[in-house]
Amino acid sequence: MSIRVLLFSIFTGFLLAAAGPALAQGSRIKDVASLQAGRDNQLIGYGLVVGLQSTGDSLRSSPFTDQSMRAMLQNLGISTQGGQSSAKNVAAVMVTATLPPFGSPGSRIDATVSSLGDATSLRGGTLIMTSLSGADGQIYAVAQGSVVVSGFTAQGQAATVTEGVTTSGRVPNGAIIERELPSKFKDSVNLVLQLRNPDFSTSLGMARRINNYATATYGAPIAEARDSQEVVIQKPRTADLAQLMADIENLVVETDTPAKVVINERTGTIVIGADVRVSKVAVSYGTLTVQVNETPQVIQPQPFSSGTTATQPQTDISAQKTGDKVAIVDGPDLRTLVAGLNNIGVKPDGIIAILQGIKSAGALQAELVLQ
């Protein structure tokens, strides 16, 4: 079975993820769950980006950049005694990366750099050798390479134009893994699959699907749903662990998720899940628009009166009330809900207020998530 996803755009910034009749969706286990023993790990480090075109840190405003540059040069055997440099071609940055599960020494991962000081752009810079450490303080990777920045800045004597973010960027494949995390995958007796979206129905369905496969292959069930998020798998004695996981992660299970409505009040974005239901409710919507226009009038003095030209303010205020429509919204499915809101011509901010009111009235059969 598959869900048909429909996108409804009522006004700019209003998005609805919808569906026809709510049906269970078939997904591979690898797409809905991850192996507990194979999780990612975060790495962090401090470094310098050099080669900037006068867009780096001001060494007076960012003393840590000057200290780091001097320490680096001293480590290279270069004397730093003398006056302070006024060049702005160096920037202090924080470097982050994600160490994937089972990452082996010598393989490469992406690194992200973010400015710490008052640099205006990292475009054209090069990250010099930076050690990346884990939460245990051990060094797991070393990053170095050219920084790729998506935004740009154009500056003149009287104006500056900036598009996107220029104070952060990426070093594609710029970090080399030097140490792998200790892994007990090969020695594991029990494996734990963790659902990315915890749900009892999905967890039990996954355990049943794995047991059907195991019974046909090994002659006995091997999986048990521990709770809404975890499914425990016991390794058969004759099974190769890598082959077992390769077979299990490609099994297709029917997934289920609770009904949710997610609202981002800053952007006016609304996402409504497929299983959202609305009980019969009446909605009234109206808006008051007030427009204020300032049109100053120029008053000229009389001839030979030695007067001066003056301006007299003139304000025109108009008010218009729109809406005041009442619609009966009864949502056996999402299409009916969208049609009901369209009938009264609501805008994104009005839709947010209406959904909050419907939830308060107890007519929205879903979880309302505000971001």
Swiss-Prot record:
GO terms for biological process: bacterial-type flagellum-dependent cell motility. Residues 301-322 are annotated as: Disordered. GO terms for cellular component: bacterial-type flagellum basal body, distal rod, P ring; outer membrane-bounded periplasmic space. Keywords: Bacterial flagellum, Periplasm, Signal. It is found in: Periplasm; Bacterial flagellum basal body. The keyword Cell inner membrane does not apply. It comes from the Bacteria. Residues 301-321 have a biased composition (Polar residues). HAMAP family: FlgI. This is Flagellar P-ring protein. It comes from Allorhizobium ampelinum (strain ATCC BAA-846 / DSM 112012 / S4). The lineage of its organism: Bacteria, Pseudomonadati, Pseudomonadota, Alphaproteobacteria, Hyphomicrobiales.
